[in-house]
Amino acid sequence: MVHWTAEEKQIITGLWGKVNVADCGAEALARLLIVYPWTQRFFSSFGNLSSPTAILGNPMVRAHGKKVLTSFGDAVKNLDNIKNTFAQLSELHCDKLHVDPENFRLLGDILIVVLAAHFSKEFTPECQAAWQKLVRVVAHALARKYH
């Protein structure tokens, strides 16, 4: 089990309360698909992903990005039980979707970039450290079924 300090919890929940889930989720997923184009193979049903412009304008990318970040919000609400919070999603991504678990880490790193861009003044080194810890824990929880 992960130990969260009171300060880490406050930093994470404080910033999360300001996050526009639709915009940041869409941007994070779009960046993942652009920066790591091999991840596009998991989204073949999304239509045109042929260029950064197409990806950024794709409504299915936007909708799924919001869904992903909404799910990430479940981690913020359940910091002391992230493993169980993501048990079903881990099973889905492993057994049905066959997603490489490394992609969870990549998306977490992208989310850090997006949050830093949107909250530059508030995204202090302490804030980054807390969020980096959170995305690592979420990525590990999502990869749990693979082990």
UniProtKB/Swiss-Prot annotation:
Alphabetical list of SUPFAM superfamilies matching this protein: Globin-like
Expression sites by tissue: Red blood cells.
Gene Ontology molecular function terms on file: haptoglobin binding; heme binding; metal ion binding; organic acid binding; oxygen binding; oxygen carrier activity; peroxidase activity
Annotated CDD domains: Hb-beta-like
One BP annotation, GO: oxygen transport
All residue ranges annotated as the Globin domain in the record: 3-147
The entry's keywords: Heme, Iron, Metal-binding, Oxygen transport, Transport
Gene3D superfamilies, per the entry: Globins
GO cellular component, one term: blood microparticle
Claim: Zinc is one of the keywords in the record: no
Complex formation: Heterotetramer of two alpha (or alpha-D) and two beta chains.
Family, per entry: Belongs to the globin family.
Function comment: Involved in oxygen transport from the lung to the various peripheral tissues. The beta chain is a component of adult hemoglobin A and D.
Name of the protein in its database record: Hemoglobin subunit beta
Lineage, broadest ranks: Eukaryota, Metazoa, Chordata, Craniata, Vertebrata
